[in-house]
Amino acid sequence: MQRCAGFLFLSLILCAALSETFGLVLSAKEKRGWTLNSAGYLLGPHAVDNHRSFNDKHGFTGKREIQPEEDIKAGNIGRPLADENIVRTVVEFLTYLHLKEAGALDNLPSPEETNES
């Protein structure tokens, strides 16, 4: 019985070694390289849209519209509006903290008091 088990074990090791040398490994095939779809998913639409090789196809816009050249050069792809909103929010918050620290907010009526009158 031990002799059969040893022979079986030895034959399995030999088969595994031979299959690796001939490239017949049972593992899954490796995925190589990036496709446009995977790069767009991982990097976002702005990274793919601004890639130079994709913008060279000026005749074919496909699903996405190409931004005008002035917007790309100036960097105005919808970010200034968001940046202005962020800056405004930060300034309002800092003003609130300054007024709270100065005690100016303690004298203001609460919203319930203004609704009652």
Curated annotation (Swiss-Prot):
Query: Does Transmembrane helix count among this protein's keywords?
Result: no
Name where it's found.
Secreted
The modified positions for Threonine amide read 61
**Prosegment residue ranges:** 20-30
UniProt keyword list: Amidation, Cleavage on pair of basic residues, Hormone, Neuropeptide, Secreted, Signal
One Gene Ontology CC term in the entry: neuronal cell body
Which Pfam family is an annotated match for this chain, by its short name? Answer: Galanin
Q: Does the record carry Signal as a key word?
A: yes
Tell me one GO biological process term.
protein kinase A signaling
Q: Which GO terms describe its molecular function?
A: galanin receptor activity; neuropeptide hormone activity; type 1 galanin receptor binding; type 2 galanin receptor binding; type 3 galanin receptor binding
Extent of the signal sequence: 1-19
Q: Which PROSITE patterns match?
A: GALANIN
What InterPro entries is this protein classified in? Galanin, Galanin_pre, GMAP
| Protein family according to the UniProt entry | Belongs to the galanin family.
Q: Its function?
A: Endocrine hormone of the central and peripheral nervous systems that binds and activates the G protein-coupled receptors GALR1, GALR2, and GALR3. This small neuropeptide may regulate diverse physiologic functions including contraction of smooth muscle of the gastrointestinal and genitourinary tract, growth hormone and insulin release and adrenal secretion.
* Name the record gives this protein: Galanin peptides
